[in-house]
């Protein structure tokens, strides 16, 4: 088929590769414009931009498309059979949704209608879901409300992070959208029951509340790794927590946030959490044992 691909982050790249490997003609790639990044704030192209250029595909980087009629006309002029959208980052107006012969298909990283919105991967882990998955959706003007063509589930393990689940779902998404284009299954409207929304994440979502249970905090850490990252403070120093182990059977009477013994086992509202890896400002992630060698933490120390 003659396709347009629209995507921006690493999540989108396997889908672009899968479409090319399946023999589809990708006539143009739309992605977010280069953004300042790194300490020098040099302009950096998106992962999809890099992948498209490596494949010799025309790249378009409009800053906005919703009300730009010239962009609508340029999009329609590509005469595509379909557009495949994977974490593009811009809202598409009806003029663009309706332009391709088969419309626009979205690769969404959840089992719709659960976790519509911006952070479905992180939200599934933080909420303690037993599974996640990918939905191939016929896009409409709503927020992830379109009819679903195909879905594929994958279990969420007790050690999955947003990073590991992201990588698994991105590969599933590429495979599934190729199948959707080949089979063209009948779209099934999403049920009205079971709708949840995944809000856009900010750094504040990472702040640990030690009055919560050890299991909940563990899910927060895993669900927000690598970004925005879960964090706490020790003596006014922000510590990013990279990995931890919940100890639900730990019996203690200490206040939440208090260290138990000469270690980084922290009292929680229910149970306790052993911090395994953490990061100080300006430093690399390190093991708890390496941290304690340089900065002993006495029993009864409070983290907030």
UniProtKB/Swiss-Prot annotation:
Q: What is its EC number?
A: 2.1.2.9
Entry's Gene Ontology cellular component terms = cytosol
Enzyme class, spelled out: transferase
Q: Which SUPFAM superfamilies match?
A: FMT C-terminal domain-like, Formyltransferase
Q: Where does (6S)-5,6,7,8-tetrahydrofolate bind?
A: 110-113
Against NCBIfam families, the record matches this protein to: fmt
Q: What is this protein called?
A: Methionyl-tRNA formyltransferase
Q: Which gene encodes it?
A: fmt
């Amino acid at each position: 088929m003659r396709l347009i691909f629209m995507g921006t982050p690493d999540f989108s790249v396997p889908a672009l590769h899968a479409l090319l490997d399946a023999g589809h003609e990708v006539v143009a790639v739309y992605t977010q414009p280069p953004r300042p990044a790194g300490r020098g704030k040099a302009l950096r192209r998106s992962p999809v931009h890099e992948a498209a250029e490596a494949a010799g595909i025309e790249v378009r980087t409009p800053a906005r498309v919703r009300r730009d009629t010239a962009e609508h006309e340029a999009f329609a002029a590509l005469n595509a059979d379909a557009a495949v959208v994977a974490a593009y980052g811009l809202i598409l107006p009806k003029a663009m949704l309706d332009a391709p012969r088969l419309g626009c298909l979205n690769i969404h990283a959840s089992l719709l209608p659960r976790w519509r919105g911006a952070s479905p991967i992180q939200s599934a882990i933080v909420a303690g879901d037993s599974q996640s998955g990918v939905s191939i959706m016929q896009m409409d003007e709503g927020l992830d409300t379109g009819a679903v063509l195909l879905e594929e589930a994958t279990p969420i393990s007790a050690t999955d992070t947003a990073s590991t689940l992201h990588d698994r779902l991105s590969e599933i998404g590429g495979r599934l959208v190729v199948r959707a284009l080949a089979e063209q299954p009948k779209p099934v409207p999403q049920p009205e029951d079971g709708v949840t929304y995944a809000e856009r994440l900010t750094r504040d979502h990472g702040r640990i509340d030690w009055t919560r249970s050890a299991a909940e905090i563990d899910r927060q850490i895993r669900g927000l790794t690598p970004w925005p990252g879960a964090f706490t403070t020790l003596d006014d120093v922000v510590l990013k927590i990279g990995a931890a182990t919940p100890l639900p059977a730990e019996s203690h009477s200490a206040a939440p946030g208090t260290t138990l013994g000469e270690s980084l086992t922290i009292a929680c509202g229910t149970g306790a959490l052993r911090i395994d890896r953490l990061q100080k400002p300006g430093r690399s992630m390190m093991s708890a044992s390496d941290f304690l060698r340089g900065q002993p933490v006495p029993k009864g120390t409070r983290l907030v």
